[in-house]
């Protein structure tokens, strides 16, 4: 049945999936950014591209490394949604 609780549950699960998929990439980018910032502070180098390039390479590397897992998680969530939709619609309007 398409109730407000069911819709909120689906939204909550979707947000959780997004956080679960994005967290490893963002955490590694954060760590690399902090390391580069500390390096810049210690050496007094204020080059803007020095912060951008390592973070971009780290993000691309993490996506390449975890891309298969991310795709599997998204596929499982999508299949679960497609399985639930007929049950929600079948009961009719509230």
Curated annotation (Swiss-Prot):
InterPro entries: Bac_export_3 (IPR002191), FliQ (IPR006305). It is a multi-pass membrane protein. Belongs to the FliQ/MopD/SpaQ family. Role in flagellar biosynthesis. Signal peptide: none annotated. One of its GO terms (cellular component) is bacterial-type flagellum basal body. Keywords: Bacterial flagellum, Cell membrane, Membrane, Transmembrane, Transmembrane helix. Its main location: membrane. This is Flagellar biosynthetic protein FliQ. It is found in: Cell membrane; Bacterial flagellum basal body. One of its GO terms (biological process) is protein secretion. The chain crosses the membrane at residues 19-39, 50-70.
């Amino acid at each position: 049945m398409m109730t407000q609780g069911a819709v909120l549950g689906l939204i909550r699960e979707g947000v959780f999936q997004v956080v679960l998929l994005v967290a490893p990439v963002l955490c590694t980018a954060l760590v690399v950014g902090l390391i580069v910032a500390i390096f810049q502070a210690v050496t007094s180098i204020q080059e803007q591209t020095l912060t951008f390039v390592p973070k971009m390479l780290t993000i691309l590397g993490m996506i390449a490394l975890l891309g298969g897992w991310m795709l599997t998680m998204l596929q499982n969530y999508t299949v679960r949604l497609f399985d639930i939709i007929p049950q929600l619609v079948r009961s009719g309007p509230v």
